[in-house]
Amino acid sequence: MSTDNPLLSDAPLPAFSKIRAADIGPAIDMILADYQSGIDAITTPAASRDFDYVMLEQERLDQRLSRAWAPVSHLHAVADTPELRAAYEQAEEKITDFASGLGQNRDLYAAVQAVADGPGFVQRTRPERALVEHALRDFRLSGVALEEPARTRFREIANELSKLTTAFSNAVLDATDAWQERIEDERDLSGIPESGRAVLREYARERDLNGWLVTLKQPSVQAVLTYADSRSLRERVYWAYQTRASDQGPNAGKFDNSERMEKILALRHEAAQLLGFANSAEESLATKMAKTPGEVLAFLRDLIARARPVAQRELEELREFARSELQIENLEAWDVAYASEKLRLARYALDEEQLKAYFPLPSVLDGMFQVARRLYGITVAPVAKSVDVWHPDVRFCELRDASGKPIAAVYLDLYARSGKRGGAWMDVCRARFHDGSDVQLPVAFLTCNFAPPAAGRPSLLTHDDVQTMFHEFGHGLHHMLTRIDLPSIGGIDGVEWDAVELPSQFMENFCWNRKALDLFARHWSSDARLPDELFDKMLAARHFQAGMFLCRQLEFGLFDFLVHADYDPTRGARVMETLEAARREAAVLYPPAWQRFPHAFTHVFAGGYAAGYYSYLWAEVLSADVFGAFEESAGEEGDVIDATVGARFRNEILSVGASRPALESFIAFRGRAPQPDALLRSYGLAA
């Protein structure tokens, strides 16, 4: 095979430094042509209807496409350029159209159905049967049974949605990069700690500017809204951040996602109805643990009923504190983080800046890897050899089993920078695949947006940042520790969307455990362990404003579900109207009328969480209950890093992927069904 084009190489890892925008189109064209030839061979009437020929061959074809597309998609998210974006969008359109055609290929559907109907099917392994069952379900959800003109229309919708969601995400990225405010007088930064100022100074230096540069990157927004004494600066940053890509704010109309949201919701609804569903919320549940919209809404509203009274009390306490101690008569949205930090400091004497000194990024990484070693008997360490990466800050680590044998790898890209999508995520670079010859080992991308090292200090993380890191590593372990050899149902692929957050949220619990913290909570300059006094304060403050936080998540989840479930073609999307309705049910603090949160809600309008944001809380029930098993084994020492329970968790949940239903895997581990009260206990809200 030609290796002139790096995207056509069979090398174990992508050659990131060699990938050019001009490589993308030719590589994808060639791979899709070969893919189609492979499908044509499978679907010829004389072809075998054997599992290996029909199913394994599809996995091989799909993996070749994935090996090329995964690095391209990743570069689009972390190293965006106009040329790359244009090439990505053109290729994405071709891939989406190809995938739509594949999902509606009746000859291929018949071939897969023939495998399921074959005499030897019941003797196949559980993962092999699951692969076939998932494929048949996905054919039905792709409109394979539709007749013309609905069949063509469904395919058109898929292509249009792909373009719109990409455009939505690009608009958010562009809007984030488009606003900045230069600060020349350091007095305007009063209240912002030195670590935060260092980040703002670094942003200015990158642009050859003197002074400090406030941007809409997460470290900057967090520093200003949490610490800046200047109320006007907080308001300006909040205004710019909360109106990104909308009809409001400093760049009103320039990157506006309003029309895109209207079209996205209309098309999702139309596609769902073509498939026979009442709405796109109902359609989304075809691949989730929850089975009906009523079940999801009852779940959310039950939590609202329990959390909202607590949140209302918390907000009144905050308002009173702001009035009496900060002379803020009317608490506004841009005051909340600032006043909350002051209240937390007053109540618990917990200084977040003091705490950050004990979470230097290198130490946190090392400790996180030690937790994984003690739980699962694996080692995670940087590789000695040079590996091709897309930015000098990127690290590459290998996972090895107890015998020292490599089993997986992960790229770590952890610092915020221009041209990089905000937030934190794990994505697949390579999936585990064994087709009887060589084994392709799983490789993950782990991406965060932490403040980079500055002023001679390493990157210092907030405790929330530490939890974010553990969360994404939990996703990574789910992907990397799979023992399933079939990529479509291995790792996170194919797992019900409202269960996929279980392994990630589970890992967050170790950030609150003394034994685990002792592995990595060390002062960046003195190497002193986290003092007991500081740990006790941290623990005491753990559930500070838990009701307000939970209500905010419930507001997001309810808005997302209602905007899909209640869509009415005669009335349009009613995005802001639906958000107001969700706030009336779930919120305790109402932002200004000009706030445009949905316009940058990429999880729902450009990610996989459409009618699925509730999944975070649903999975949190599962993860809290799972962690309960570790707490039960901890004994008086409180050591929850139990290798025996860890091995059971790995064997029953992490490693089985989607080879069986998530509920079945949960029961295999816990010995019973999930208990919803586990979530309330984890928030300190249980009666």
Model-identified regions with their sequence ranges:
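Membrane-entry segments of alpha-helical transmembrane domains in multi-pass membrane proteins
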Residues: 16-28, 50-55, 253-257, 296-303, ...
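C-terminal non-catalytic alpha-helical accessory regions
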Residues: 32-123, 553-563, 567-584, 591, ...
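His/Asp/Glu-rich acidic catalytic environments and adjacent acidic regulatory segments
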Residues: 2-30, 35, 77, 84-291, ...
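Charged/polar positions within long, soluble alpha-helices
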Residues: 40, 44, 67-77, 96-107, ...
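C-terminal, non-catalytic "cap/extension" segments appended to globular domains
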Residues: 1-23, 30, 190-191, 198, ...
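Short pre-active-site segment immediately N-terminal to the catalytic Zn-binding motif
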Residues: 451-470
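Short, hydrophobic/amphipathic alpha-helical patches that form generic packing surfaces
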Residues: 64-74, 137, 239, 336-344, ...
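Active-site-proximal, well-structured secondary-structure segments within enzyme catalytic domains
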Residues: 127, 131-133, 155, 160-163, ...
